[in-house]
């Protein structure tokens, strides 16, 4: 039997068209944890007019925004061999009045052999449980974004499963941070407003279409178009929220490992960094500050940290902030377990689940904190508040990609909560941190749409290897193309091989990853074994030199960060953000802009050589002052270990800090000076 549904088309003033269709009980709403409309957004009325075989939707200024084709296709009917195709929905959108974004109305071989449908629902067990939406794809079209994707820059041909899960590294299809948003080389992007598990095929299943399949019988898509990639990303932030500005101290060096075990050990390390003039702002305590390692109870071990408040105050006087690891699960042996179960602060399990005993899985814990339940959220905030009141300045909101799926949550089914959980978790930690300390910040691993409002995020458990470094950079680039401004990664990778915990990191990997970290929005050393530079004596002086460079660059980083939180820019910028028309840039994932002025090409091999692509423009080698014409490749460039290819736009003005400091507390940013990259510039380290 024929079924009829209402397709809603809304137009917003900044080049955004919205399509909504609910197959059943779903209704269009702007009330969502994922949405946070900016003041720039307003709905504009649409008028409808029949023009020939099309219904045209246009705004008051006469700009066409959509065309619905109802004209019968021209036929020369000579054969009845095959049946006519089904009726289809042939709509072309013009979000900014310029770009044509057409639904994939005719993606089939012959009836009934359909590769895709423009809009459809899918039935399982007799119910409408899934929905699909498809847009046309062009043969030369490229795609990027979708979260922290550890793939090459151009995602065309990929079919992605948008389900948050522990990535277990940065060299596979799994990822901690899925974002239901992509960018196209045709200068548009699409945000699918859902937290359901979904599949996104970017001309993968069918080379003729971009197909979105949601495990929810509802479609709510915002199509954003513009003249620049940054404009499209800003439109996405106008829908889902802008990043907040991290505090000054967060842009300094963070030092960590898995893990420090006592106050004495931490004090010794911090004192040595000051004595040997390694600038550093944050010391992070990972899994070893509890009564039992990994047993997260949000309380210090009384024997190893006998006076935590005094310990934190001593570090603060010496210019260090303290960051603490924890997670959103409660262990069976935790002292809070009875309270958490009795009050259903953790979601009750419907059946017992097996554990793998690794401490790296939600299944190893008794339950997941239910952030859909306001009382549970306030209880969790209270656990953090007692730590923040002691002087802790940042909470590492680790995990959050996985939840107990066989559990009953107060406000949402687990199938919908799985992806959204990261947002609710990080929001709670961010809010209480800002309330107590005045600084809005977390150190987070998982993400979904909207999480960019609560910086910052890091890239998860990379391997301390060249492929781990390359995978991290790829993930960071796609993450920046998904609406996030701030991102970091474990320097020099999290785990080692072949022994996960105990293999030694190679000196060149440590050094090259340090250079990469210096030119990232935030730099943190972390991993399964020792990360302090004096454990790598052959390169320790070089590491110190690069750390000092980092602190010199903080005024520039602050300047670019202020720009980022008011626009669509990330700090780590794929080349396509500046050169979307340059086809080469859609295939370069080992270079990036750092802010709008630096071009960075990390070395990721032991041969100390790499090819470097200079985009159009005039470039100056930051370290030597050499001037180079862009629009070309530099082949087989030899780069000594103490150097990294970094170029600056000619005539750029880079604010730098002229004095050496131990930490950002010693900085007075009004003392910053302007480094002019003009004809007089001879190089940063050139005497």
Features from the language model and the residues they span:
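Catalytic and substrate-binding clefts that recognize carbohydrates or anionic sugar/phosphate headgroups
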Residues: 2, 8-11, 19-247, 257-258, ...
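Generic recognition of flexible, low-complexity loop/linker segments
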Residues: 6, 167-170, 177-179, 240-242, ...
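Beta-sheet entry/capping signal
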Residues: 6, 16-18, 180-181, 187-190, ...
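An acidic- and aromatic-residue-enriched active-site/binding cleft used to recognize and process polar
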Residues: 14, 22-24, 53, 60-62, ...
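Aromatic- and carboxylate-enriched substrate-binding clefts and catalytic-loop regions
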Residues: 24, 80, 84, 94, ...
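A conserved hydrophobic secondary-structure block that centers on an alpha-helix together
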Residues: 171-172, 246, 256-306
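Catalytic core of carbohydrate-active enzymes
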Residues: 430-435, 439-440, 447-458, 468-471, ...
